[in-house]
Design a protein with these regions (language model features):
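Active-site beta->alpha loop and helix N-cap motifs at the rims of alpha/beta catalytic domains
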Residues: 2-82, 115-118
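General "foldedness" signal
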Residues: 15, 19-22, 46-50, 72-74, ...
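Catalytic alpha/beta core domains of metabolic enzymes, predominantly
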Residues: 84-174, 180-190
């Protein structure tokens, strides 16, 4: 399960930390990613330490950049030094992956690549994901995550380019039952 401040607002929740605690009751010991919402080194470090203290199964989501476009690499380095489970999010380019891999290579961090948004830009996200997965798997013990899926078939794309994790909306997950239908049968259901 992954959660961020924009999903928090979209779902109408009132208190981010209370909502995170509520989610932890349902997820038990499964991996959960909660994102910091600060936009400075100090805020991110403070929030990451607090979020990770809520449970051992939490991966703290750190965006690859601050809102001003500057790298959060120093934040990532600090949190790796303090053994915080990390999910580096909002990745779009191979250059971004190459920049963080030396710091993350010996961790079990998650690298969240926004494949759906890459597609939205007119670039073939399958090719980009495959190349980024080659970088990740070739020089680290990190896991890759296909984020921001746009269609059910993204699940197949994620498998075919060797992605470890995919996040999908509930609507997309329920549509996966259609994978078992022949196209003829599917057309009759339309």
């Amino acid at each position: 399960y992954t959660f961020n401040p924009s999903l928090f607002e979209k779902n109408g929740a009132k208190n981010y930390i209370n909502h995170c605690k509520k989610i932890l009751k349902y997820t038990k010991n499964k991996p959960v990613s909660f994102e910091v919402f600060g936009d400075s080194y100090e805020e991110m470090i403070k929030q990451a330490n607090f979020l990770s203290s809520l449970s051992k199964n939490i991966y703290v989501k750190i965006p690859i950049t601050y809102t001003n476009g500057q790298s959060t690499l120093k934040v990532i380095e600090n949190l790796v030094d303090h053994n915080i489970n990390l999910n580096i999010t909002a990745i779009f380019t191979r250059k971004q992956v190459k920049k963080i891999l030396p710091t993350l290579k010996d961790t079990n961090s998650i690298i969240s690549i926004f494949a759906g948004r890459i597609y939205d830009s007119g670039v073939d996200a399958f090719i980009e994901m495959r190349e980024m997965n080659n970088l990740i798997k070739g020089s680290s013990s990190c896991k890759s995550l296909w984020a921001s899926s746009r269609m059910v078939y993204d699940f197949i794309h994620a498998i075919n380019c060797n992605t470890d994790i995919i996040t999908m909306s509930y609507d997309h997950i329920t549509k996966m039952k259609n994978f078992k239908l022949s196209l003829k049968k599917f057309s009759l259901n339309t």
